[in-house]
A protein has these predicted regions:
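Active-site bordering "gate/hinge" segments
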Residues: 1-172, 194-251
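Short beta-strand elements
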Residues: 166, 175-194
Length: 251
């Protein structure tokens, strides 16, 4: 418990530190998508909701979201089926849709830095991530202080054919799983749609807008700005390294 209490204090200081950064004044018209639970800050269970009014069980995910191949990339782009538009998953989406379910100290910090309401500036996602670290420490302390061992270490089961779907919140955003098993309990099919791929189209959209705005600047600054824009989404493809190759043709 003392180690967790120290971690909570350090996490709170981290929020204050990240909130002091000088962020670019950028706003994007995001559609936020996240898991939601009325009684807790959703992480492992709940319904999939959006800032545009969507509210569905995880089993209906594929009825409302689609992955599409685009000519310029081998990465699939996730979009909303009804509009074909991009959407955002991750810490900004979770805080926008679930700030009321935060633990007391995390909720107070969100309110103090304007993240108790939707934030459309992707650069401030680092503050949202820091607030979620505070949330995690508060959750961990509660679990440790009130833990009661379960009657059994796992649920007993008998193999049979079936199909199931579920969604959880990974640090980077909504993570969708869909599995089918045969009568012997062996995997017949599996489909996983991770948060990085769901944000891929939105990342490219942001890059396009940024590049248009910064074209008058020099090539080095443009490349650095594009890298920063990608890292706002913490995609696993970048590992937060200098990876982006920018090819610029000027007329």
């Amino acid at each position: 418990v003392p180690a967790l209490q120290w971690g909570l204090s350090a996490a709170i200081e981290t929020v204050h530190w990240t909130a002091s950064f000088d962020f670019p004044d950028v706003q994007h018209d995001y559609t936020f998508v996240a898991l939601h639970h009325d009684d807790e800050y959703a992480m492992n269970e709940g319904r999939i909701v959006s800032s545009r009014g969507l509210d569905i069980p995880p089993g209906q995910f594929l009825h409302h979201f689609a992955e599409r191949q685009v000519p310029h990339s081998t990465a699939l782009h996730a979009v909303l089926r009804d509009t074909g538009q991009t959407y955002l998953v991750g810490p900004l989406a979770r805080l926008a849709l679930n700030h009321a379910q935060l633990r007391p100290q995390a909720r107070a910090l969100a309110a103090a830095y304007g993240l108790d309401r939707p934030c459309f500036n992707p650069y401030r996602s680092i503050v949202a991530r820091a607030i979620e670290v505070v949330q995690a420490y508060e959750e961990a302390l509660d679990i440790v202080q009130h833990y009661r061992p379960p009657a059994e270490p796992r649920v007993r089961y008998t193999p049979r054919a079936g199909h199931g779907a579920a969604a959880t919140e990974a640090p980077r955003g909504l993570l969708y799983h869909d599995y089918a098993v045969d009568a012997d309990g062996r995997l017949a099919s599996a489909r996983i749609i991770p948060p990085t791929s769901q944000n891929q189209a939105q990342i490219e959209r942001d890059l396009w807008q940024l590049a248009q705005r910064l074209l008058p600047t020099d090539d080095a600054r443009l490349a650095t700005a594009c890298e920063q824009a990608v890292r706002n989404y913490d995609p696993c493809i970048s590992c937060s390294t200098h990876f982006l190759k920018v090819h610029i043709e000027r007329g």
